[in-house]
């Protein structure tokens, strides 16, 4: 269900809410959390609403609208969502430093740019439901997405001990249309069995353009020109069938899912023009048994995943088991203990596998790696939870290992004679640590609530050459929330830290946001301010030992003290059909690199 479908449910019609922070096998590799809302069935009903939040001084808009009508076994729905960003005051500072052919190079550039995007999603929905017998739903979505960047800058370019002043231009845009049809059918077979089917078809028509130019100011000599055009037509199909059999003391769930993405590329870049096709196929066969005895419950699952990626350069075929074990025990006084272990496979994303090449600076390009292999993840969690009038907290110990981890790094590039930022399957990657999350209510009510997330973590990466990199940090997010009658005041903040991201260290986005909401009947009025006293900040730098030493700091000054106003209206009356969609799939996202 979409956010708008959830909004359309009147609280008086909710029977119960089922929350799965460890989703069943059928959601494996697609969702970290699943929420199932069970509702009543009055006779006739309708719902409609709208939600709009906008900044007053810069381009920031989040909006949505929906309408639904239910009569008898039939449910009709219409939805629209828009997210718009248009920022014209971002300052980016970039440095590159490297040695090539016994010559030392350094580029220090400051760039000011204007960038943004517009995302729109229009959806039509029809459902036919006979409670306890069958569910049929058809959804047609059309996504319209566009983004742009216009930047100018200056750089001090140093060759050994000689400095020159350069001008730079960076322009890019990307847009795609994406119609998607999602068909779902579920039928109860007798009292103990249920069969579900899901079929999704989507099409992307994508156009991407990038132009980068750098030249020496003193004599207008070109340093480099990067002119890239990509047109891609992408077709995605996902099909899944699942069966559930209920035993007296347990439940057996089994299924098979297949997804295929085919992309036809028409590319012009700095190495010439080319037309090529790629195909990414993934299959997943699974079965899972779950049961509960007294205070002990368990889920035992086993499956197999096949990833078959084919490009002009190579064909990759990967088979891997996907076992999963969940053991839970209920302790006295609202306490519980749970252990989760699972092994999964993940295919490289399309841009990582791309054959495209774009110029970044003089002697440095960025490219994909068609020979990149699937990575395998082994995740382990031990979770302790407890709740009472004052506390609702979870403490987690985790240890995760990734084999053939996707990591970006710089390497010598024979094709261009310089360096290339590309992908490799690192030899090993692991992360271990602890996590404390939840809420504290000092007064035992919602007058004051502290929501917290604290996670001391250690990450370790081993490259294909055996070089070891390590990062230790404490990631955190906090929120202070006060609710009094129909007013809600909240303040969110964090302490940004550097975390390991491939062969780079990336800093968390800073947060200092304050919001005030007032609810009156079906209306909600809101106001607030993002990034109090500071612009949003982003910082990435390469690890020591990288062939190219890189750093990038950016600040978006448009959203410093960004004041927003919001208004929403949600009305719901009468019948709400109960649609428990047991299969939820998506095709691969657009390929834009």
Regions found by a protein language model. Give the residues of each.
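C-terminal extracellular loops and terminal segments
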Residues: 17, 426-430, 447-513, 517, ...
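Outer-membrane beta-barrel translocator domains and adjoining extracellular loop/strand segments
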Residues: 31, 89-103, 149-164, 208-216, ...
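Outer membrane beta-barrel strand-and-loop segments of large Gram-negative receptors
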Residues: 236-238, 278, 284, 373, ...
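Membrane-proximal, glycine/serine-rich, low-complexity loop/turn segments characteristic
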Residues: 1-155, 170-205, 233, 237, ...
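Extracellular loop and loop/strand-boundary signature of outer-membrane beta-barrel proteins
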Residues: 51-53, 106-112, 163-171, 222-229, ...
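Surface-exposed extracellular loop regions of Gram-negative outer-membrane beta-barrel proteins
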Residues: 32, 37-51, 150-154, 253-260, ...
């Amino acid at each position: 269900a979409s956010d708008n479908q959830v909004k359309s449910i009147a609280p008086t019609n909710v029977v119960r809410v089922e929350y799965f922070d460890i989703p069943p096998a059928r959601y494996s590799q697609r969702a970290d959390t699943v929420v199932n809302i069970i509702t009543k069935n009055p006779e006739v009903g309708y719902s409609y609403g709208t939600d709009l939040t906008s900044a007053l001084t810069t381009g920031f808009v989040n909006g949505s609208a929906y309408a639904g009508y239910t009569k008898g076994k039939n449910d009709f729905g219409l939805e629209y969502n828009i997210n718009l960003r248009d920022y014209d005051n971002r300052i980016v500072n970039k440095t590159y430093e490297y040695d090539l052919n016994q010559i030392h190079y350094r580029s220090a550039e400051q760039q000011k740019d204007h960038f943004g995007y517009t995302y729109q999603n229009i959806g039509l929905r029809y459902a036919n439901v006979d409670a306890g017998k069958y569910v049929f739903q058809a959804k047609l979505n059309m996504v319209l997405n566009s983004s742009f960047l216009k930047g100018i800058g200056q750089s001090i370019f140093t060759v050994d001990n000689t400095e020159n002043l350069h001008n730079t231009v960076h322009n890019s845009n990307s847009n795609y249309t994406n119609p998607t049809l999602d068909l779902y059918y579920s039928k109860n077979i007798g009292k103990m069995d249920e069969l579900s089917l899901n079929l999704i078809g989507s099409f992307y028509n994508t156009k991407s353009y990038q132009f980068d130019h750098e030249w020496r100011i003193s004599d207008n000599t070109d340093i480099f020109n990067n002119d890239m055009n990509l047109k891609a037509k992408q077709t995605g199909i996902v099909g899944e069938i699942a069966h559930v059999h209920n035993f007296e003391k347990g439940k057996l769930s089994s299924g098979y899912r297949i997804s295929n993405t085919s992309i036809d590329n028409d590319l012009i870049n700095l190495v010439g023009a080319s037309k090529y096709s790629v195909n990414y196929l993934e299959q997943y066969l699974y079965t899972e048994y779950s049961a509960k005895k007294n205070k002990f419950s368990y889920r035992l699952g086993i499956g197999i995943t096949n990833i078959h990626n084919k490009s002009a350069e190579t064909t990759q075929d990967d088979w891997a088991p996907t076992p999963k074990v969940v053991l839970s025990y209920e302790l006295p006084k609202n306490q519980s203990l749970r252990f989760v272990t699972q092994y999964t496979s993940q295919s490289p994303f399309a841009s990582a596998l791309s054959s495209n090449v774009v110029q970044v600076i003089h002697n440095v390009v960025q490219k994909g790696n068609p020979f990149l292999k699937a990575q395998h993840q082994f995740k382990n969690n031990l979770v302790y939870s407890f709740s009472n009038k004052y506390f609702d907290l979870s403490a987690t110990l985790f240890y995760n290992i990734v084999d053939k981890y996707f990591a970006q790094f710089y390497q010598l590039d024979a094709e261009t004679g310089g360096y290339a930022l590309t992908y490799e399957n690192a030899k090993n990657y692991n992360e271990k640590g602890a996590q404390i999350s939840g809420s504290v209510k000092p007064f035992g009510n919602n007058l004051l609530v502290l929501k917290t997330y604290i996670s001391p973590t250690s990450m370790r990466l081993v490259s294909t050459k055996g070089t070891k990199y390590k990062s230790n940090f404490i990631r955190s997010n906090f929120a202070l929330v006060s609710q009094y009658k129909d007013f809600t005041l909240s303040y969110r903040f964090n302490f940004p830290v550097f975390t390991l991201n491939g062969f780079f260290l990336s800093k968390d986005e800073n947060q200092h946001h304050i919001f005030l909401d007032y609810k009156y009947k079906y209306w909600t009025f809101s106001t607030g301010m993002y990034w109090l006293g500071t612009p949003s900040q982003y910082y990435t730098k390469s690890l020591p030992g990288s062939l190219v030493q890189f750093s990038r700091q950016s600040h978006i000054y448009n959203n410093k003290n960004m004041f927003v106003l919001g208004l929403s209206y949600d009305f719901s009356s009468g019948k709400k059909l109960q649609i428990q969609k047991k299969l939820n799939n998506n095709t691969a996202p657009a390929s834009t690199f």
